[in-house]
């Protein structure tokens, strides 16, 4: 499966910071994601290059914290 480039856009910068901490903790528990996922952030956007972008969307939607975000597949 080819990797997809996605961009997560958050409405507030502190939301990106809160999300990043939780998401990267989750990634560290799922080592296969870390190997298959490259990421960086610019302003309120988190750019991810991954095989598993649908899993990222599911993770965000199933999290107890609700984030004001959208995903764009690049």
Label every PLM stretch briefly.
Residues 2-12, 46:
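Short glycine-/aliphatic-rich beta-strand segments at the starts of folded cytosolic domains
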Residues 19-25, 56-64:
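Short amphipathic alpha-helices in soluble, non-transmembrane regions
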Residues 32-37, 63-74:
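Conserved short beta-strand edge segments in small beta-sheet-based binding/regulatory domains
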Residues 11-34:
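Short amphipathic alpha-helix segments
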Residues 9-11, 49-51, 72:
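A structural detector for beta-sheet-dominated domains
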Residues 26-58:
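Acidic, low-complexity, intrinsically disordered interaction modules
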Residues 1-2, 74:
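Short intrinsically disordered terminal tails
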